[in-house]
Structures are given as structure tokens and as C-alpha cells.
Amino acid sequence: MTKILVTGLIASGKSEVCARLAQLGYPVYDSDSSTKLLYETIPGLKARVEQAIGRPFSEISSIFRDASAREALEAVVYPLVLADFRMFAANCGGETVFFESAVAFGKPQFKGEFDKTVLVRAPYALRLERNPKVLDREAAQQEMPLDEADYIIENNSGLQELHDQVDRMIKAFEI
């Protein structure tokens, strides 16, 4: 099975790329939604997170600029997300599975997990227009260096152009 990471900074267009992939029949693991589900379904996970970050769970969004709290959170949550993704991949039955995540690149928990990487990029002004919280959360992200991406999608035109780029990526990967 080929596992492909779709990454990019917040509001770059990862979700729209993955929506196109799903529309074409590819299984896509949405790490944000899946993580929220894990918080609700794993008994005691919220308490473990609170203990790790030293704050109430309701304040989890305030840790993005606190590197030590963010790393403590990642140490608790990322292994669970990775295990959940592996189960998803094993059960999807396809030859290719996509993993959507703004933060998986460069994290040791995900090293060696993906066969290919797709970097979705968009101009800063456009990302800020799409999501005004870009500034608040950007500190928690590291964009993949261009030379480490197997494929780059430049999301600076319309939706049809984005879909066309996804289609070209599929052809380039021969999947």
C-alpha cells in the first residue's frame, strides 16, 4: 500500500485537495477530524492531555506558541493518531491512502511513515483571507522544504485549477 502525506500550512487548501481525492474514490484520513474523535472516544485521553500540558483541556488551542506544551501534547496524541491511521489504512482496502495533516511533516512520530509527500501551497494573503487565525497557529507549523516534497500543488488560482492539479498529481504518481 502506498501512503501519501498531504501537507501544507493552515488554509493552504489541503482539505480541498483531499475532498477532490475522496471525490475520485481515494481513501483520505483527515487527521484533524480523527484527532477530535479520538479525544471523544478514548477514555481518559483528555485527562492525560491536561496532565501533559499543565492546563485544562478547554485551553488546548492556547498552546500553539508554547513549544514545550505543544511537544508534550504531541507526545501523548501523535502515537494514537498514527495507530488510528494505520488501522484506517489497513481497513480501507485500496492500494493508495492519503493522510491530510498540517503538522505531520518534520515530526519524529511520523518519520518514515509515508511513501510520498504532497505539499499544498498558497500565498500568505490568501491563507489569511481564508482563515484569520493563521497568525495564531502558524507558530506550531513548519512548512516542508520544497525539495523534500514529491509533488507541489500551488493553490493560487480557482477551484477548477486546483482540481486539475490534483488530477495531474495522480497521473504523475501513477496511482
Question: What does each of the following model-derived ranges do?
Answer:
Residues 1-2, 19, 58, 87-92, ...:
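Catalytic phosphate/metal-binding cores of nucleic-acid and nucleotide-processing enzymes, i.e., regions
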Residues 34, 123-126, 158-159:
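Conserved nucleotide-binding/hydrolysis micro-motifs of P-loop NTPases
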Residues 84-91, 96-130:
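ATP-dependent NMP and nucleoside kinases share a basic, alpha-helical "lid"
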Residues 1-57, 164-175:
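Glycine-rich phosphate-binding loop of ATP-dependent small-molecule kinases
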Residues 85, 93, 110-112, 131-175:
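Small-molecule kinase domains that catalyze NTP-dependent phosphoryl transfer to phosphate-bearing small molecules
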Residues 4, 29, 116-118, 151-153:
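Hydrophobic/aromatic beta-strand patches that form the interior of the parallel beta-sheet core
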Residues 38-40, 127-133:
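Short, charged, surface-exposed secondary-structure boundary motifs
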